[in-house]
Amino acid sequence: MSSLPRAQVMTPSAPPVPQRRVLAARLEPFDSYWQAPKDIDAGFRSFTAYYKANYLGRLPAARDTSILVVSCGPGYLVHMLREQGYHNVLGIDSDPEKVAHARRHNLPCETAHAFEFLEGREGAYDVIIPEQELNHLTLDETIEFLRLCRRALRPGGQVIVYAMNGANPFVGSENLSHNIDHFYNVTEYSLQQILELSGFTRIQVFPLKLYVFWKNPLNYVGLAVTTVLELLLRGVFVLYGKKVRVLSKKIAASAVVP
């Protein structure tokens, strides 16, 4: 007498563990802000002045605006936003030591990797600002990141990004080649292209001001020299048939979700 085949017992499989997105940068990852003085606490004053001069006037006036700061580092930009009355702010950074420093200053920051954090947060924010340069991503990674930002923003939401300016003939090439984790430069035209490819509209490109420390006399010297040089360079570009408006060391843009 033959025995009946035994029924197979199906055990439910465990849900797959999400894999962290491995980015191309090896030493200075995009989702962790590395640029800080040796005395990290001293940076709060200087970076507050820098961010106020470059970003504050481009943000929505409503202080309940939901703002995400990606690659927040020790919390410089988050600190400025909180100081200016924005109370619905969150910073994320992939380096727990930097986040720990921000939290010692009672800043709302947490450890997270940017790509994974943005996935599944559709329509969660009004403004997203990466504190790290876009060029710590490859071009494909940049567009992927910006599309994640677009999905995480509400309709009419805003992203503010920046990168190294390849149009500056003095520092453009050096900026690109001195760091193996710098993958490209942009100009005002190519930065606009990147944002358009990522689905953003109402793109406004602007220079990032370096000389914003008015108590330092050298600030005025630097501002005067760079102003004259940039004026002369615009004339040279015209002779080559190029209309270049932004020649600052770093170039930024604000863009909106349609």
What do the predicted segments below correspond to?
Residues L107-E110, S177-I180, V221-L223:
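Short, hinge-like loop/turn segments at secondary-structure boundaries
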Residues F183-S198:
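Short alpha-helix
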Residues N135-L137:
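A short His-aromatic
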Residues L153-V159:
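Short glycine-dipeptide loop
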Residues V161-H182:
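Short, glycine-/aromatic-enriched active-site segment of Class I SAM-dependent methyltransferases
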Residues M1-G123, V127-E131, D140-R147, S248-I251, ...:
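Conserved N-terminal segment of class I S-adenosyl-L-methionine
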